[in-house]
């Protein structure tokens, strides 16, 4: 585990894009990221986050690199801090099937930005060019390179995981609480046995194939 000093240095290193934007005259820099582009079931969720200038949040990193315990701690820390501005966007399975997952992801991001308390004047977006009235910078692997995007990734991931746990209560046979809708061996087996439920993405190949094979609830 990294020391406090090492974590603080890492936070500063990953603030380079935010600092550059501020040097260019921007003041409300929001990181934007998504969770749930790849799963076979459940919504796609986006997070947006504006971190206060001059405040260090130890441990902030790409949500995929954190343990569930670390991620939950940071999620609650970000939400409970009155100086942190967080927004969430959620796009349904029906909408994903209607417009495709890429466009649905962009819609979720726009929703997340709109749900922020303040209006950002610059966006740092993980991996996507986002058509938006606010100027933006696409950053490849941004969740590992920008603290604002990393914070947004934590918000999106934890929020979506909570939604999938709720879906598990409704459809326990699929194991949504464990794989969160991703195409694990156990999920594919359940899909083959039970067929898709209303929360499966019917435009995604394994789900589409199960429908074509005539497996239905």
From Swiss-Prot:
It comes from Chlamydia trachomatis serovar D (strain ATCC VR-885 / DSM 19411 / UW-3/Cx). InterPro entries: RNase_HII, RNase_HII/HIII, RNase_HII/HIII_dom, RNaseH-like_sf, RNaseH_sf. PANTHER family: RIBONUCLEASE H2 SUBUNIT A, RIBONUCLEASE HII. SUPFAM superfamilies: Ribonuclease H-like (SSF53098). Belongs to the RNase HII family. It comes from the Bacteria. One of its GO terms (biological process) is mismatch repair. Keywords: Cytoplasm, Endonuclease, Hydrolase, Manganese, Metal-binding, Nuclease. It is found in: Cytoplasm. Endonuclease that specifically degrades the RNA of RNA-DNA hybrids. Manganese or magnesium. Binds 1 divalent metal ion per monomer in the absence of substrate. May bind a second metal ion after substrate binding. GO terms for molecular function: manganese ion binding; RNA binding; RNA-DNA hybrid ribonuclease activity. Its EC number is 3.1.26.4. Pfam families: RNase_HII. A divalent metal cation binds at residues 33-34, 126. It catalyses: Endonucleolytic cleavage to 5'-phosphomonoester. This is Ribonuclease HII. GO terms for cellular component: cytoplasm; ribonuclease H2 complex. Residues 27-216 form the RNase H type-2 domain. Its cofactor is Mn(2+); Mg(2+).
